[in-house]
Regions:
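N-terminal secretory signal peptides that target proteins for export/translocation
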Residues: 1-5
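Short helix-onset patch at the extreme N-terminus, typifying the N->h transition
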Residues: 6-9, 57
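Beta-propeller-forming repeat regions
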Residues: 21-391
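Bacterial N-terminal signal peptides
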Residues: 8-20
Length: 391
């Protein structure tokens, strides 16, 4: 499905410098998983066997699959089947992350597939045995994002997840939650749930961001939501301010409404003024943008980029400021890098075309000391990574 370009830019100043790909060395594309039958929404990377090569963990065609680097030999570690949760699973997780849930020193897998669950990494992750499946939360529903973060500042990671479905499908409709790991995650039926945005996140909420925005020492949480016929109150960017007691309801701050197809919003100091800003994308619409703190003026960066459904923020060129990477979700998507000059002015580099992505992450895939780009291809049905030519 191709989108029609917007007639006009949505708001305020557009700051974008177009930089040709030929001006610098091209990024090399490496295929981890060739196209499969179904869609691939998310992929994460870690060296599970400590052999010096990153492995990739993803889900597709009804299984969670561990791809052993550097040859990417597949090892199925879980098969989705009805009966493990109240809702029938889909062929793949909509989003995933890694977290040492049980504190044993290895990275466990957390996924959202009509329920939120975790798979315990065994001592021998490539032995052929299935990783043990356990429930995180089977009551929230519509968790388009699972994000680790120490919400209550107790030195232990928690999990942030959304519950976007309506009241006919979940007792926590149009809400956002953070979930505490129970004392014994191996035996607990579910994690400790805290609804911090109680029916306060309408529409098709997508991805969350985590970080202290107002400088009070307490991390806050941002979110974006698409709209549409099924999500009539979406199309917004907002953040929630953490109170002294994080188990209570948080204060919502709407950044912008009427943002067609809003999906991603992440906090970072983009102009090096010591104040937190937000970088955002409209992944079910058009454009990338940022909100300049502390007043959060909306500044368009590239208002016509189609379907930038994924986002990550890191210093890609190692010049001391935060850059952005994104990719369109359709099969003809554009892989784009926005290099920051340190003042919030961004130079666009088109790294590739005809590559879709639901999930894009910056990670050093080849161990050379710079950030590469890992992409789960969704409409492209593949997993690829792009090698940073910096080193």
């Amino acid at each position: 499905m191709k989108l029609a370009l917007p007639q006009t830019a949505l708001t305020t100043t557009s700051i974008l410098l177009i930089q040709s790909l030929s001006a610098e060395s091209a990024w090399t594309k490496h295929v981890i998983q060739p196209p499969v039958q179904g869609k691939i929404h998310s992929a994460v990377a870690h060296d599970w066997d400590a052999d010096g090569h990153l492995d990739v963990l993803s889900s597709f065609d009804g299984e969670v699959v561990l791809l052993k680097g550097p040859t990417w030999a597949p090892h199925a570690i879980h098969r989705f089947s009805p009966g493990l949760a109240r809702s029938k699973p889909r062929p793949a997780c909509i989003h995933t992350c890694l977290m040492d849930v049980d504190g044993d020193g290895d990275q466990d897998f957390i996924g959202s597939n009509n329920t939120v669950f975790w798979l315990e990494c065994p001592d021998q992750p490539f032995s052929g045995q299935a990783w043990t499946y356990r429930t995180v939360d089977d009551e929230i529903l519509g968790s388009h994002c699972v994000l680790p973060g120490d919400v209550n500042r107790d030195g232990k990671l928690d999990l942030i997840a959304n519950s976007s479905r309506d009241a006919t499908r979940t007792p926590y409709p149009e809400s956002l939650a953070w979930l505490e790991v129970p004392k014994d995650p191996h035996t607990a039926e579910s994690w400790v749930r805290h609804i911090f945005a109680d029916r306060d996140a309408p529409g098709g909420s997508h991805y969350t961001g985590f970080g202290d925005v107002n400088g009070d020492g307490r991390p806050d949480i941002s979110c974006a939501a698409k709209g549409g016929e099924k999500f009539p109150e979406g199309n917004w960017f907002a953040w929630w301010q953490q109170p002294e007691d994080p188990t209570q309801v948080w204060t919502k701050h709407l950044l912008a409404a009427d943002q067609l197809g809003a999906t991603n919003i992440l906090p970072a100091d983009l102009n090096n003024d010591g104040v937190v800003d937000y970088f955002a994308t409209r992944g079910h619409g058009f454009g990338v943008l940022w909100f300049k703190g502390p007043d959060f003026e909306l500044i368009e960066v590239d208002p016509t980029l189609p379907s930038p459904h994924s986002l990550d923020l890191v210093d890609m060129d190692q010049d001391g400021d935060i850059d952005a990477i994104t990719c369109g979700k359709e099969a003809d998507g554009i892989v784009a890098l926005y290099l920051n000059d340190g003042q919030g002015n961004f130079s666009k580099r088109t790294l590739d075309e005809n590559q879709g992505s639901y999930d894009t992450r910056a990670i050093d895939m080849d161990g050379d000391g710079d950030f590469d780009i890992l992409i789960a291809g969704q409409a492209s049905k593949n997993i690829v990574w792009y090698e940073n030519p910096l080193r």
